[in-house]
Amino acid sequence: MRVELLCTGDELVTGLITDTNSTYLEARLFDLGVKVERVVLVGDVRPDIIQSLKEAASRADVVVVSGGLGPTADDFTLECAAEAAGVPLEEDAQVLDWLHQRYAARGLSPNPSALRMARVPQGSEPVKNPEGSAPLVVMKLGGAQLFFLPGVPREFKALLEGEVLPRIRATLDARPERTYRAFRLLRTVGIPESELDIAVAPMGPRHPRIVFGFRTHAPENHLKLMAEAPSQSEADAALAAVEVECRQMLGTKLFGVDSEAYAAVVLETLRRAGATLAVAESCTGGLIAQQLTAVPGSSEVFIGGAVVYSEKMKSAWVGVPPDVLARHTAVSRETAEAMAEGVRDACGTTYGLSVTGYAGPGGGTPEDPVGTVYCALSAPGVPTRCERISVTGDRDRVRLFAASHTLEMLRQHLLAAPATP
């Protein structure tokens, strides 16, 4: 099955908003064993939308179209669809009823602009939108099935999950020549994408049913595995075999699979160890704490954090001795170690993490230029450990990789530590 996605709207092609619908659709279809072959962004230009619809329908079995279904003058995607199909727009009584119900629930009546959303191409199938006013519209164009969805991500996702994906799945199941697929997304940190590619290359001949793919989601790199076979059992077996080999190759650089998030994995590793954590952050400005507290239940193991940006607060809040700051500066191995030890003592936790550095664009010294970061871990029974890293890129990138490296020091320590009885 060939699937294409057409996203409409001037706001997409001018950079005013970022298209997130396509990445969501690609990921969800990948779970079904379907690869999106093409994604097209087109502005609010009628001839361009009409031509794009015709071209996509000539190539694909399924075309998912987002945007341009609302009540305003620049919402004319369905008008373009009707023209592409050579049929008129018709006012649908059921959609009219849905609109009146939705507006009445808010004590309103739909105005003439809102009623435009009831006009759909002749012969199409409107489907009620559980999250908004504009319906999903399903129609045929040539040999392709077209799904028209609102561009609002919340509405797009609801209709995709509730209607579009089940229909695509049913079509796949009904095909006698169906290729069965199985998937795994291996999430890594601390290994460059180029090294992943080199490590995976020899596996291809040994696993002919596997399609390897790569995705960078800084600071992570992901390895995508897709098995294709004549039956589901064969696809599952092929995936299991290659996954074993990949896990052996990646070792502890592999932190999770599929939808497992890094911060959640770190917190779960802490929880299994019966340990607690506190952090002292300077250049990252609370980014580590933000990542951890975004995970529900993090308070079970994450006790607290301090953003100690100035030298004064490094001493006042986490007990960095003033003479350490005077001799070694705020960005140094000695200061990072004192921060980690100080926040651990102050919070009474098993572990203390710290990070201090030059995120840029200003600052830095000849010995420690912009991008230099010191990350430290204070742990029971062992000397405090500090690692110096050098990150290239802008301020946000330095902060992102500094936070990642600091947490990874803790994760690797926990993996190497003896299991709690």
UniProtKB/Swiss-Prot annotation:
Q: Which domain of life is it from?
A: Bacteria
Q: Name one Pfam family in it.
A: CinA
Classification via CDD domains: cinA
Similarity section: Belongs to the CinA family.
* Descriptive protein name: CinA-like protein
What organism is recorded for this protein? Myxococcus xanthus (strain DK1622)
